[in-house]
Amino acid sequence: MAMNLLNTASIAKEMQTKVTERMGDWFEAEFKAKANSASRRTRLIRSHGHTYTYARYQNTGQLSSNLKQVKKGDKIVIDAGTRANYTSGYHGMYFLVEKKGMQEVKTTLKKGANYANSMKL
């Protein structure tokens, strides 16, 4: 009788860590790109016969530099830092306060699911 010497538990654990690391890298890069594009986005204000432009979220450029991966047990969390990491105490999470930002989070999560399903190890 031949015994199967494959340790499936260790193989599954290794696969889980590889998938978690790749997904963490992918989400970090994706959210940094979204934060950079938000920092360049301008708003048009029409007032008193003139048109003014200004960057609505000027500190979101800081958001992309403050995003980092934090390993918590078996999981990887993308952390945006605290208010102290930003100038003027502004946290920079435009994703939570603007409709366009919330839509970008939804599409990024959908893309993440598709990326996980199409990942080749």
Curated annotation (Swiss-Prot):
Positions in coiled-coil regions: none
Keyword match Methyltransferase: no
Major localization listed first in the record, in broad terms: virion
Protein's cellular compartments: Virion
Alphabetized UniProt keyword annotations: Viral release from host cell, Viral tail assembly, Viral tail protein, Virion
One GO BP annotation of this record: viral tail assembly
Record's keyword annotation contains Metal-binding: no
Domain of life per record: Viruses
Entry GO terms, CC: virus tail
Role description: Plays an essential role in tail assembly by capping the rapidly polymerizing tail once it has reached its requisite length and serving as the interaction surface for the connector and the tail tube proteins.
Subunit structure: Homohexamer. Interacts with the tail tube protein.
Family, per entry: Belongs to the Skunalikevirus tail terminator protein family.
Name under which the protein is recorded: Probable tail terminator protein
Biological classification of the source: Viruses, Duplodnaviria, Heunggongvirae, Uroviricota, Caudoviricetes
